[in-house]
Amino acid sequence: MYKNLKEVLTEAERINYTVGAFNAHNLEMVPDMIRAAKDAGSPIIIQTSVSTARYVGMKNFVAVCKTMANDLLVDVVLHLDHAKSFDDIKEAIDMGYSSVMFDGSSLPLRENIEKALRVVEYAHARNVSVECEIGTIGGTEEGVTVAEGVYTDPKQAIEFLKAVDVDALAVGVGTHHGQFQSKTELNFPLIEELHSLITKPLVIHGGTGVNEADYARLTENGIRKFNVGTELLVAWTRAAKHQFEETELNNSLRNNIMPCNEAVYDVVYHKTGLFLNKEHLTVGAK
């Protein structure tokens, strides 16, 4: 079914697992992402940046996600990631996205609260979920670089949540956007403190750089949404580079693109198995 974020994270909280949120960098990769989640036995969050949503067309993402959710009988959330503008968020909601993120993390706390309240009011009236962020994630995403991340201040997080009824909260705990050649040192004492103080589902951004050995500990400490973007981009691009370098110029474009999407399938299937603690899952079980 096509669901909102709150619905799938409530179930994840009840059973104690984490849901993978995978960034779609084009429309081509989305069907294989959803098939991978179906085969792994998990819901999936397909998320897009604002710029990717505009490149592909929001209605196109909505149509594919709704169709495949119904055809494959798998729970799919379509989420707008790191939106800073109310107009962008409103457009996504009006086009049919089931979840949005308002990122006011760079704003003073009071301004973040005021703008988040407006988003929540509009979204919840339309059964759309809202994620917000306290603290910042370092690294580069969509051409925007944040030199250093800022750890989430637990007191600010509590103050924010007292004022704003968000459905999930992204926290700064040491991860970085765009990191794939090294691994992140997570601040587990902070994660544990946040989990002890906050009842809302917590979200990890910049998940590609997180050591897979840490996944289970993150789940036990309330991480219910785990974002993966760069790893999918690298897998798809690496496969594309190989295909276009090794095949003739008149090779079917379909035959060149399919291995790229299969590489994305493998990443989503593998990660989803780890998020579910299903160690028997293996890459490529299609």
Please state what every model-predicted region is.
Residues 3-15, 26-51, 59-75, 82-200, ...:
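Alpha/beta enzyme core
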Residues 18, 104, 252-256:
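Short amphipathic alpha-helical segments at helix-loop
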Residues 55:
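Cofactor-binding active-site loop characterized by glycine-rich and histidine/acidic residues
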Residues 204-206:
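Thr-Gly-centered strand-to-loop micro-motif
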Residues 241-286:
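Extended, intrinsically disordered, low-complexity segments
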